[in-house]
Amino acid sequence: MLKIGIIFGGKSNEHSISVVSGCSIVKNLNKLKYEVLAIYIDKNGTWYEVLDDIANMPNYKLGEEPINLKKIENIIEYLKQVEIIFPVLRWKD
């Protein structure tokens, strides 16, 4: 089973759109084929692992943020466990 990291959020003015898009991708990936890690970047640039089971949650709406988060202290080390990275980010405006 491939381990995929979906990265969303970030410092952009379109932060909320990235959150909605990232959560949609997490919810729709085939969990029989992929182990999915949802990785959220807040508006200050801090990285978090999303501990919420996004696949079983209602759709995130614009302006909402994941609630149950664990801060990632060293993103380079953290990403070593991931085989594929899928960034769902916008450039900072």
Predicted regions located by residue number:
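ATP-binding N-terminal substructure of ATP-dependent carboxylate-amine bond-forming enzymes
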Residues: 1-93
